Amino acid sequence: MIINQRDDRHAQVIDAARRMLTAIRTAPKAKGNDLIEGAIVEGDDLRRLSDAMLELYAETSRPVYQRDAANILQGDAVVLVGIRPQPMGLNCAHCGFPTCADKPAAVPCAFNSIDVGIAAGSACSVAADCRVDTRTLFSAGMGAMRLGLLPGCRLVLAIAVSATSKNPFFDRK
């Protein structure tokens, strides 16, 4: 049997995306509290995510949503990393409020945001090891939250993933 890379490209990207999910799960977390969630979006769900981003563009007139909605369709998948918000109870004031009790519920604990960033960075590191191209997008994360793709998560980043001869996430207009 001969497996042509061009024919197997999607499966290779999904394999890398699965490894990225492992990196998300094993990334260090504040106080060891695992509040992180991850998922892979592909196929028809990738189109749904793009459509949700176009809805955000229509509502906000922010061009980033329109540009990124088209851009994610140039890849094979999007890896989502999100967090179920929970204050760490450290009263560190890193969020801008003196104590956790003073912090409004709508304001995320700074450590929740840090944990999502660390997990996304860990996932992108694995993607680089697999030699697939990525782009971390807040816009696609907003679309994912709109669709409820990571239930309970109020902060979501999306990592678009591709394995083509030219990185589709690099020269964007």
Predicted stretch roles:
Residues 1-173:
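Acidic, surface-exposed loops and disordered segments
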